[in-house]
């Protein structure tokens, strides 16, 4: 099946947007739904079935749903996982259609590709916390780790939640975040791309806090959630974090 693609790779589309025309099909395809690619075919036109980002690979085209993925914005705090180590940069999975780029000069002072092996600093699978320095949809987002508290994550645990649930995890004027930190005694860093970094002074508190976070994610739409989370933490921890926070 030969396609005439009329959208750009990684373009944002809406339901009903035409993505491509089928050429040399032999006969007209009146209607065919392709649910795993989130598109359907109507009169030899490939059409988006939802709001998402187009992924074009050769003669294959699909739409990645925006629900559950993160669209970068400048200055956002993000946590990424190193998925590729290059000669001059690392590629980070930031739970987005757009991979994050962390240049070696951000991590290695006086970087020289002839001297420095990037794997000696960050390797595949490492977690990194940083900020979106540049992003304009014409290029992959550039990550900076220059700043207090940024860089390789070497302690604690990283939990993933849907990016769309992050505002509920923070709460109005930080109410849910303050509840979680005060009652658990843990240090919590919430990244906009749906990763949460926890540093607790014991394993049990970390386990309970993860359960509370998953409860918030599951019931984000429900009223009275703050009180339910408070009761859950009181029951599991018996009185909160006693003000003990890690530096």
From Swiss-Prot:
Residues 75-148 form the S1 motif domain. Its main location: cytoplasm. Pfam families: KH_6. SMART domains: KH. CDD domains: KH-I_Rrp4_prokar, S1_Rrp4. GO terms for biological process: CUT catabolic process; exonucleolytic trimming to generate mature 3'-end of 5.8S rRNA from tricistronic rRNA transcript (SSU-rRNA, 5.8S rRNA, LSU-rRNA); poly(A)-dependent snoRNA 3'-end processing; RNA catabolic process; U4 snRNA 3'-end processing. InterPro entries: Exosome_RNA_bind1/RRP40/RRP4, KH_dom, KH_dom_type_1, KH_dom_type_1_sf, NA-bd_OB-fold, Rrp4, RRP4_S1. It comes from the Archaea. GO terms for molecular function: poly(A) binding. It is found in: Cytoplasm. SUPFAM superfamilies: Eukaryotic type KH-domain (KH-domain type I), Nucleic acid-binding proteins, Ribosomal L27 protein-like. GO terms for cellular component: cytoplasm; exosome (RNase complex). Keywords: Cytoplasm, Exosome, RNA-binding. Residues 154-220 form the KH domain. Belongs to the RRP4 family. HAMAP family: Exosome_Rrp4 (MF_00623). Component of the archaeal exosome complex. Forms a trimer of Rrp4 and/or Csl4 subunits. The trimer associates with a hexameric ring-like arrangement composed of 3 Rrp41-Rrp42 heterodimers. Non-catalytic component of the exosome, which is a complex involved in RNA degradation. Increases the RNA binding and the efficiency of RNA degradation. Confers strong poly(A) specificity to the exosome. PANTHER family: EXOSOME COMPLEX COMPONENT RRP4, PNAS-3 RELATED. This is Exosome complex component Rrp4.
């Amino acid at each position: 099946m030969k396609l005439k693609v009329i959208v750009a790779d990684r373009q944002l589309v809406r339901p009903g947007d035409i993505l491509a025309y089928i050429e040399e099909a032999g006969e007209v395809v009146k209607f065919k739904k392709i649910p795993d690619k989130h598109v359907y075919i109507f009169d030899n036109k490939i059409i988006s079935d939802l709001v998402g980002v187009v992924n074009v690979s050769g003669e294959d085209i699909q739409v990645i749903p925006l629900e559950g993925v993160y669209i970068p914005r400048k200055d956002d705090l993000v946590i990424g996982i190193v998925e590729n180590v290059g000669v001059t940069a690392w590629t980070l999975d930031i739970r987005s259609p757009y991979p994050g780029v962390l240049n070696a000069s951000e991590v290695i002072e006086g970087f020289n590709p002839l001297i420095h092996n990037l794997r000696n600093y960050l390797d595949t699978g490492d977690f990194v916390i940083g900020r979106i320095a540049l992003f304009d949809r014409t290029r992959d987002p550039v990550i900076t780790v220059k700043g207090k508290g940024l860089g390789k994550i070497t302690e604690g645990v990283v939990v993933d939640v849907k990016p769309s649930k992050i505002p509920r995890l923070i709460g109005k004027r930080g109410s849910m975040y303050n509840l979680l930190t005060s009652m658990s005694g843990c240090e919590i860093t919430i990244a906009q791309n749906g990763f949460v970094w926890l540093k607790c002074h014991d394993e049990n508190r970390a386990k309970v806090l993860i359960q509370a976070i998953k409860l918030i994610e599951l019931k984000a739409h429900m009223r009275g959630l703050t009180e339910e989370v408070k009761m859950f933490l009181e029951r599991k921890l018996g009185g909160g974090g006693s003000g003990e926070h890690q530096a």
